[in-house]
A protein has these predicted regions:
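Metal-dependent amide/peptide-bond hydrolase catalytic core
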Residues: 66-209
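Histidine/acidic-residue-rich, glycine-tolerant segments that coordinate divalent metal ions
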Residues: 1-105, 189-190
């Protein structure tokens, strides 16, 4: 992706970047400009408990699945603390939930994605989610391992580029002024966000040619 290309110096002599996606827009509109997107952090989570026979001696086990369930409920309870302006999204799946129904699950694994509109918002939401995960493990008496990785940074469109693009579209293609969606904020993410943190960038969506 663009992060690796950036790391290797592929953008060292580039002053600005424009990215275009094709999309059916409708409602008489043909192009979106001023597109801003969320950034995200990914988490690989492992809850570690202790196996035991689920019928004979469940009291001897430490149920990792219960830790994960509590952690998810903790995350849900946190949602009202996420500010609307940050467009926070927390998505989670259990990728490994135990081996046998007759055995108290000793290891449960999850994948989590935390999205937000700003870097500060990403860090704040990520910290809260980690707290929720740790609380789930603590309540049952087990352990949790959290491996955080930065995905994409938030996409911040350069408004001057957007204005210039619109002006040229109207002049050279005959586009109508009201055919543009001028503020398109999405909770999705794009690797163009990383570039937008260091140079002027623009991300447009347009219908077919």
């Amino acid at each position: 992706g663009k992060q690796e290309y950036l790391k290797r110096g592929g953008f060292d002599d580039v002053d600005m970047a424009l990215q275009c996606h094709m999309m059916e827009i409708g409602n008489g509109r043909h192009c979106t400009i001023d597109t801003d997107c969320n950034g995200f952090v990914t988490k690989t989570v492992t809850f570690i408990g202790e196996a035991a026979h689920a019928g004979f001696a469940p009291h001897e086990g430490i149920n990792a699945l219960n830790m994960a369930e509590l952690a998810l409920n903790n995350i849900h309870a946190l949602r009202e603390t996420f500010q609307e302006k940050e467009k926070v999204r927390v998505s989670a799946i259990i990728t490994e939930g135990g081996d046998l129904v007759n055995v108290v699950p000793a290891v449960v694994k999850m994948q989590i994605m935390v999205r937000a509109f700003t870097i500060d918002g990403m860090l704040d939401a990520s910290k809260k989610v980690n707290r929720a995960l740790k609380a789930g493990a603590l309540a049952i008496g087990g352990k949790v391992e959290i491996d955080d990785k930065i995905g994409y940074l938030p996409m911040n469109t350069n408004r001057e580029l957007s204005a210039l693009y619109k002006e040229n579209m109207i002049e050279y293609t005959g586009a109508e002024k009201d055919s543009f969606v001028e503020l398109y904020e999405t909770a999705g993410s794009t690797d163009l966000g990383d570039l937008s943190q260091i140079m002027p960038c623009m991300h447009i969506w347009t219908e077919g040619i």
